[in-house]
């Protein structure tokens, strides 16, 4: 037969809203804030509110799908297989996506239930003669693999090479329509039956884009967040876990989908704009200059881009800005009690920032310059203030950092302790020190 393999040119706008809608909503927002301004004569509310809401609308536009396949098949032994039966034998495309399985089921083993590497997909029309269609490589987690061709098979056999393999969903397409599929044979069944690979067919995409799957470093951070949300033994050796726990909280509350795991970044991106406004106001004491700072922040491409991906940068940057905000407040304060409160809050946000990513340690150096400049200028209660700073900027961040590990199963057969947190951070340092790997999103 003639087989028409179409690249299915995909419209990047997938039904959430359109740029024209954004302009419409932004106009409504401006009108509403103008009416508030006319009534209350509050310039700050009008300017800042307009900037923040318009930026928020743009930031959340086409953020991600509200659903994606979740239930995952995993074998109980090596070299396990099952057979699917198709409603028609002709098809042109296979889409497959894998997620993480039940790591906790691997009793006593420091391994992870993860990946399609080595899985063989075969086709047959008589259940006796089998043709090899494809042998899958690992590929990134929660990113689709597509196999295109001209196929004619009634039965599909999936052969896993390792008990650590997983498949979340598989779908077969013919001329843009999905082919009906059912399980023909599944000898092992059990807790994770073969039916799990075809139970969410309405959620699988024929032409996936960023909107439908993991993108960039979401393969690390969102994977870890889902492990935390599901109470799974986790693979975490790249960064501290506060930011990951924030994403995990949203997944726990609202379910697992691209929109949900990217939403915390959008919220913190909006908070960054507000924080920039107020730190500018504290520095310049001018509403208009503060608005300029906030607008410049909204126009920064890195700020917008990283806020729309399930990464850690929005959390880290927000906490860094806040630790500087309270240090600037300390610098401009004359009341000693209020000075200490501002130093305490600066230290708390410093602890939060370092608990997201280690690069906040570099940012914290600037706090010391501001602190010592004021101490040298004022020359009052220097020793007493420095002693308080040992508590605020050393002990306090260490305690926050360690407590951020409490919700997480980093240790399979052990529990949280300061010793275990320390050893885990040594492992993270070793990972970054020895890392020499490529990345499929890297610049060339």
Task: Label the predicted regions.
Residues 11, 58-132, 138-210:
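Aromatic, loop-rich ligand-recognition surfaces of beta-strand-rich domains
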Residues 61-66, 177-196, 210, 214-226, ...:
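Transmembrane-lumen/periplasm boundary regions of multi-pass, lipid-linked membrane glycan transferases
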Residues 70, 187-204, 210-222, 234-246, ...:
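Extracytoplasmic catalytic/substrate-binding loops of multi-pass membrane glycan-assembly enzymes
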Residues 256, 276-299, 317-318, 334-341:
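Transmembrane-helix signature of polytopic, membrane-embedded enzymes
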Residues 259, 263-284, 322-326:
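Transmembrane-helix motifs of polytopic, lipid-linked glycan transferases
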Residues 261, 301-315, 358-359:
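Short acidic/glycine- and proline-prone juxtamembrane loop motifs at membrane-interface regions
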Residues 281-284, 323-343, 353, 375:
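Membrane-interface transmembrane helices that cradle and orient dolichyl/undecaprenyl
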Residues 294, 340-357:
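Membrane-interface alpha helices of multi-pass inner-membrane proteins
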């Amino acid at each position: 037969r003639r087989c028409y393999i179409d690249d299915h040119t995909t419209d990047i706008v997938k039904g959430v809203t359109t740029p024209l809608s954004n302009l419409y909503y932004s106009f409504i927002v401006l009108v509403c804030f103008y009416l508030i301004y006319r009534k209350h004569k509050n310039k700050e509310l009008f300017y800042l509110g307009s900037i923040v809401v318009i930026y928020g609308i743009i930031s959340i536009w086409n953020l991600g799908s509200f659903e994606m396949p979740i239930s995952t098949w995993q074998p109980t032994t090596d070299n396990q297989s099952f057979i699917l039966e198709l409603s028609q034998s002709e098809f042109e495309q296979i889409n497959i996506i894998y997620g993480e399985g039940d790591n906790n089921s691997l009793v006593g083993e420091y391994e992870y239930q993860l990946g399609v590497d080595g899985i063989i997909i075969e086709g047959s029309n008589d259940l006796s003669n089998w043709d090899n269609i494809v042998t899958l490589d690992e590929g990134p987690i929660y990113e689709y693999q597509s196999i295109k061709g001209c196929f004619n098979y009634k039965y599909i056999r999936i052969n896993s090479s390792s008990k650590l393999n997983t498949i979340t969903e598989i779908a077969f397409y013919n001329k843009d329509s999905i082919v009906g599929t059912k399980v023909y044979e599944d000898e092992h069944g059990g807790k994770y039956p073969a039916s799990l690979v075809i139970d969410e067919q309405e959620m699988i995409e024929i032409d996936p884009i960023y909107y439908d799957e993991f993108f960039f470093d979401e393969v690390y951070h969102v994977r870890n967040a889902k492990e935390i949300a599901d109470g799974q033994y986790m693979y975490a050796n790249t960064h501290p876990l506060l930011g990951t726990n924030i994403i995990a909280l949203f997944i726990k509350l609202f379910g697992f989908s691209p929109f949900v795991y990217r939403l915390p970044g959008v919220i913190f991106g909006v908070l960054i704009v507000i924080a920039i406004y107020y730190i500018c106001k504290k520095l310049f004491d001018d509403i208009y200059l503060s608005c300029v700072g906030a607008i410049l922040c909204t126009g920064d491409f890195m700020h917008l881009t990283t806020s729309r991906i399930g990464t850690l940068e929005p959390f880290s940057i927000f906490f860094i800005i806040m630790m500087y905000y309270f240090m600037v407040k300390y610098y401009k304060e004359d009341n000693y009690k209020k000075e200490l409160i501002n130093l305490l809050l600066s230290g708390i946000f410093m602890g939060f920032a370092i608990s997201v990513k280690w690069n906040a340690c570099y940012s914290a150096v600037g706090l010391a310059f501001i602190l010592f400049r004021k101490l040298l200028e004022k020359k009052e209660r220097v020793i007493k203030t420095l002693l308080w700073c040992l508590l605020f900027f050393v002990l306090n961040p260490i305690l926050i950092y360690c407590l951020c590990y409490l919700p997480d199963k980093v240790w399979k057969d052990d529990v949280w302790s300061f010793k275990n947190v320390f050893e885990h951070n040594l492992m993270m340092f070793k990972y970054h020190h020895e890392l020499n790997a490529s990345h499929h999103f890297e610049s060339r």
